[in-house]
Amino acid sequence: MQDKYSPSDVEQQAQQHWQALDAYRVTEHARAADGSDKPKFYACSMLPYPSGKLHMGHVRNYTINDVMTRQLRMKGYNVLMPMGWDAFGMPAENAALNNGVAPAAWTYDNIAYMKKQMQSMGLAIDWSREVATCSPDYYRWNQWLFLKMLEKGIAYRKTGTVNWDPVDQTVLANEQVIDGRGWRSGAVVEKREIPMYYLGITKYAQELLSDLDPLGWPERVKLMQQNWIGKSEGVRFAFPHNISGDDGKLINDGKLYVFTTRADTIMGVTFCAVAAEHPIATHAAQSNPALAAFIEECKHGSVMEADMATMEKKGMPTGLTVTHPLTGESVPVWVGNYVLMTYGDGAVMGVPAHDERDFAFANKYHLPIKQVIDVKGQSYDTTTWADWYGDKEHGVLFHSGKYDGLNYQQAVDAVAADLAAQGLGEKKTTWRLRDWGISRQRYWGTPIPLIHCESCGVVPVPEQDLPVRLPEDLVPDGTGNPLAKDPRFLNCTCPSCGKPARRETDTMDTFIDSCWYYMRYTCPDGETMVDARNDYWMPMDQYIGGIEHAILHLLYARFWTKVMRDLGLVKFDEPFTNLLTQGMVLNETYYREDASGKKQWINPADVDVQTDERGRPVGATLKADGQPVVIGGVEKMSKSKNNGIDPQALIDQYGADTARLFTMFAAPPEQQLEWNDAGVEGASRFLRRLWNFGVVHGDAIRGGHGNGVVAGATDADRALRRELYTVLKQANYDYERLQYNTVVSATMKMLNALEGAKDAGADARREGLGLLLRVLYPVVPHITHVLWTELGYAGAYGDLLDAPWPQVDEGALVQSEIELVLQVNGKVRGSIVVPADADRAAIEAIAAKDEAVQKFAEGKPPKKIIVVPGRLVNVVA
């Protein structure tokens, strides 16, 4: 055993040992020593995109997963921790465009490098289950399930208004539009009509909502999904009209349908607004150039609800009217830029008096405002909005004819009944959730397995011809989808008639790839999409990933699972029983502004920071020139802010165990972690102390006997054991709660206790260090493995990989003596030591004889002695 701790040597030794054992290869139905089946535990981190290098967020995520699975393995579980690559996507195309290489080559090179980085971290990954979503063996099942969904009517083709990213030249799902911009390119998103393929996720809306309740997920994530699914109870009804199209037929059969959750305000309708793409708007624009220009302007606006809420509300009258279904009055129809054709029927009723958006719109365009809800003691002002105008809890109807005096629910019921009696409306549940448009006009993705034939139309690729393989040697040139220009891919034969045909050149949204990869881990070599091994491992026991995936990935994966269930492929309803959303890794930011005012971000490693006496930063200078830089504050590590820490550089300098220890100790897993160089050095120092303790006491520990101290223990031995097992009890509790930061804190207390127990014997130290190594092993497996092996523990307990998890010796916690605070007349004057089983009389006698009592009571006999068991004695003199 080396005298000096060398992380590189220690980690190489441990990793070679695990590799020789093939230590992390997992099989189904593993058996315990007694022949019983081990309970399974499947813990998985969200698979990474192979961008080229790991970042500290990856390190934290995978270390959390690793700590969890290593500890559970020691507790007797059959644990699975797999890894794969979310390998399709636009970044590979962009990199290929910039570097003149095929996306496939770029992707596979990155995978190789990142896999090597993960292996250097000592992660307990079963690499025999590795999956790359760009592999034909994987994406063939994307294609296969798509065709099954097509058969069932879940997948379908239609032309609709979509989010179009003009830079990436592709369609985006609503979730991929952030603040009106493309989530990858940052370009302002436009509306566009385009034929594409959809998956009917709305068919599962109620189930997706209801099944959230029992999941062990953060409430924040559940709420985000609930809001996105967006269940609304209301009334759908029609405004009759006699507007005819060019064919002489009434548009939409003479009915303009709207949906509202406020049917109680129907008597306050003073206008209707339709989307720019609505047939009535299109018809009106034919004879109105100004309206046609306005409609074109609307089509270039955002299609996101969040943007609709904040953007300026614009409108233009069509000159057409519809009829109020209950009063018979004419209601003018406007085109509004805030109305989406993709939501509901593409039209809304306007009730300015009781809807804040309509109120602003009506005041802007001088439309009538008719109050029909009254709240006692309030006065209505048509020029200034007040919150009570939209109150449905306290108001009653007035100026509403037969409905006057009704409250919200009474009015909704009455209005719905009257509309139904006329055949013009009914109560209805609507959803914010929209079907998932999966067509992408990109190359590097799963080809949609369809063929276009002039004679037969759209024809599915026969199952025996799957996968439709993506050519991996294409290099994008920035002028559209390379697949559309590659005759090898494009030209084919129609499977129905045998005539020349062409393949579909759209590829699938890459979120398809991440919908089910975690199931493929269970049976990566399977000849079917999933098999019986998936039944063993799924549903997953613990999923780990960032909060940013709360809607996008997690909702789609849940939907995909339910489709697979309905097709008889799986037997469960939900894929992820528990979810941990780890906090982001933060770091300081620094910058200078160039002549144009643009910020040039500087990496923290290139900056010297000046601090005050309390350690707070007060200034910073660039190391290269000694000139000041601006301190930008603490933000998420990112390339854009140039404040990332290279994990490989950290591992090269300090070792993987130090990186793991710091990321676990610095913050609870679900909270943000703020980078701290001093904290990294502290983690390294702790590991050196641990190693040094093993070196100093190595001979005595190797010569110790047994697995614990039972007979012949000294007071020092008992004190050490009591302290260690007290800490172990808390550490076990913290492991159950996934509070790994306090687990690390517990191991530091254990090492402090061992170092401080100068009078403890070798057996007590041997037992104590054995406890410490096992508790610490999941966090820092390399150093603990080597110490465990070198100091002889493997002979007693076996390999640390599967050593039994330490149980608390309750007998060690029992104290023969306890210390009580001693008070005289309510003031603390010292303490007394009494037998742990001493009764009240014995405690009173000991207290009365104490020197402090004699001194402060001035020799007088006590008037009264108050004993608070286990805590204190108060002598009243």
From Swiss-Prot:
Substrates-to-products reaction catalysed: tRNA(Leu) + L-leucine + ATP = L-leucyl-tRNA(Leu) + AMP + diphosphate
Keyword check for Isomerase: no
Gene Ontology terms for molecular function: aminoacyl-tRNA deacylase activity; ATP binding; leucine-tRNA ligase activity
EC main group: ligase
Motif 'HIGH' region location, chain numbering: 48-58
One GO term (biological process): leucyl-tRNA aminoacylation
UniProt-listed Enzyme Commission number(s): 6.1.1.4
Keyword annotations of the record: Aminoacyl-tRNA synthetase, ATP-binding, Cytoplasm, Ligase, Nucleotide-binding, Protein biosynthesis
InterPro entries documented for this protein: aa-tRNA-synth_I_CS, aa-tRNA-synth_Ia, Leu-tRNA-ligase, Leu_tRNA-synth_edit, M/V/L/I-tRNA-synth_anticd-bd, Rossmann-like_a/b/a_fold, tRNAsynth_Ia_anticodon-bd, Val/Leu/Ile-tRNA-synth_edit
CDD domains: Anticodon_Ia_Leu_BEm, LeuRS_core
Keyword Signal applies: no
Matching Gene3D superfamilies: 2.20.28.290, 3.10.20.590, HUPs, Isoleucyl-tRNA Synthetase, Domain 1, Valyl/Leucyl/Isoleucyl-tRNA synthetase, editing domain
Name of the molecule in the record: Leucine--tRNA ligase
Gene from which this protein is expressed: leuS
